[in-house]
């Protein structure tokens, strides 16, 4: 630390020299990196260009910082064509010299999805070429194609082409690509959830988080929010096309061709269920074909839906339970449990709905939406629980507490959680009510299906 002022002086002294006079690539690397860290991209540029041109395989920082430096130049220089051309070639060079990350895993998907992103952002190529670049990155290396913004723009580019009437971009192709990208979002979300769940379990056990834990949690929360935002945007786009009026004839026309394709059947059934098209006879055909082809957690769940629709709740729950037995992955099981809870909530089976929501949380502690569902169950029971008006309204405190927990385990739900908490709290007894009834700090127990209690706030 004592030498820091001297180091800064040295760096700025170097910065005043022309890049051509500094022959040592490692020195240039250090100089441009220091400038780039403080976003002084103009000063970084000449030193960076020297390293890129003379020592392209020296360090991957040349490409990581180069992307930022060139992006700045493109946005801030009137004559930016040169920088656009350099950026275009930067990604090709990046993959040529650093095709794998430090763990030995391919970076093709990451690098070329970034290239497609830059092509889109700076409008340097036709949409078809931008999409082809995204598509090559995704199909050749889906593992490292993980940036949520790039995933969203990958699909949005195809959607724009579809709406503009591009040849060969059919509705079928659009839905198929949506499923591909949506499933990738799920995979990335599961990775983030595993990190958050590990840390949440440590916190719940009363253990102290290490600095590494805190950093991992912070990064996972930030990425989780971004993932959730772009996934919601993706769903918003497809919802414009995914009506029952569009889905049913589309899947009907393709059914015979795909009735032996397990993946296609699962996707079609899932989409029809999500859009509440399960009353159509086609849904029955899809489910029966899927179950006869390969009895699985998915097919058993969909049969449960059919039984539920027919009012056969006991049989429906039996198939839901079979679905859970057939599913070995805890995170997929959590999603099934949540969907079962949501179905039961719609049918007014509150106690059973909470049971499945809590089981979902046991499998995935970071599933904030399960807390949102339970909070809604409590709020819907305000008139059914409690021996007097004060106790009936007190149920809203329990609902508010539960809604608050959603944001604790899943920060991407912060806005929803806060709005619900405020809404429920606003319907709970006021300070005047508490004072008048003399209930401050009293514990109120609910003998209805809730079988829980809440402590009245202190004045």
Question: Locations of the language-model features?
Answer:
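Bacterial Sec-dependent N-terminal signal peptides
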Residues: 1-25, 67
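Preference for long, solvent-exposed alpha-helical segments and helix-linker "stalks"
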Residues: 20-282, 293-294, 418-424, 434, ...
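Residue-level recognition of tetratricopeptide repeat
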Residues: 33, 68, 117, 156, ...
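Hydrophobic/aromatic packing residues within the alpha-helices of TPR/SEL1-like helical repeat arrays
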Residues: 48, 84-91, 134, 287, ...
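Canonical positions in the second alpha-helix
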Residues: 51, 94, 137, 289-290, ...
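Short helix-capping/linker turns of helical repeat alpha-solenoids
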Residues: 58, 295-296, 332, 366
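Alpha-helical adaptor scaffolds
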Residues: 301-314, 321-368
């Amino acid at each position: 630390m004592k030498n820091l002022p001297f180091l800064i002086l040295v760096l700025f002294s170097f910065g005043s020299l022309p890049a051509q006079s500094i022959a040592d690539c490692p020195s240039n690397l250090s100089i441009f990196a220091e400038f780039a860290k403080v976003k002084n991209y103009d000063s970084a540029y000449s030193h960076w260009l020297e390293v890129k041109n003379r020592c392209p395989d020296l360090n991957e920082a040349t490409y990581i910082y180069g992307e930022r430096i060139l992006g700045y130049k493109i946005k801030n220089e009137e004559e930016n064509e040169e920088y656009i051309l350099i950026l275009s070639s930067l990604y090709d060079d990046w993959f040529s010299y650093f095709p794998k990350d430090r763990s030995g895993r391919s970076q093709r998907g990451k690098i070329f999805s970034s290239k497609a992103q830059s092509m889109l952002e700076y409008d340097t190529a036709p949409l078809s070429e931008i999409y082809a670049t995204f598509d090559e990155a995704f199909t050749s290396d889906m593992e490292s194609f993980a940036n949520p913004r790039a995933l969203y723009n990958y699909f949005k580019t195809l959607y724009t082409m579809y709406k503009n009437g591009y040849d060969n971009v059919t509705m079928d192709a659009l839905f198929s690509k949506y499923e591909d990208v949506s499933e990738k979002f799920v995979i990335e979300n599961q990775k983030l959830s595993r990190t958050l769940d590990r840390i949440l379990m440590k916190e719940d056990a009363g253990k102290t988080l290490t600095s590494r834990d805190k950093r991992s949690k912070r990064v996972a929360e930030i990425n989780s929010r971004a993932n959730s935002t772009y996934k919601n945007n993706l769903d918003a786009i497809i919802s414009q096309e995914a009506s029952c009026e569009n889905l049913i004839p589309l899947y009907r026309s393709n059914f015979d061709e795909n009735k032996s394709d397990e993946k296609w059947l699962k996707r079609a059934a899932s989409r029809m269920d999500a859009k509440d098209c399960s009353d159509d006879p086609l849904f029955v055909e899809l489910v029966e074909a899927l179950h006869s082809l390969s009895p699985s957690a998915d097919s058993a769940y969909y049969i449960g839906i059919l039984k539920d629709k027919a009012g056969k709740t006991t049989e429906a729950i039996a198939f839901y339970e079979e679905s859970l037995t057939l599913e070995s992955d805890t995170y997929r099981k959590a999603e099934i449990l949540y969907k079962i809870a949501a179905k039961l909530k719609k049918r007014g089976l509150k106690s059973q709905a909470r049971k499945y929501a809590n089981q979902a949380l046991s499998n995935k502690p970071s599933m904030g939406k399960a807390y949102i569902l339970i909070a809604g169950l409590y709020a819907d029971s305000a008139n059914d629980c409690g021996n007097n008006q004060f106790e009936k309204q007190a149920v809203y405190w329990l609902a508010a507490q539960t809604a608050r927990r959603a944001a604790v385990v899943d920060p991407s739900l912060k806005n929803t959680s806060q709005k619900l908490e405020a809404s429920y709290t606003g319907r709970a007894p006021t300070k005047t009510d508490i004072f008048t009834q003399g209930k401050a700090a009293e514990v109120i127990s609910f003998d209805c299906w809730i079988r829980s209690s809440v402590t009245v706030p202190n004045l």
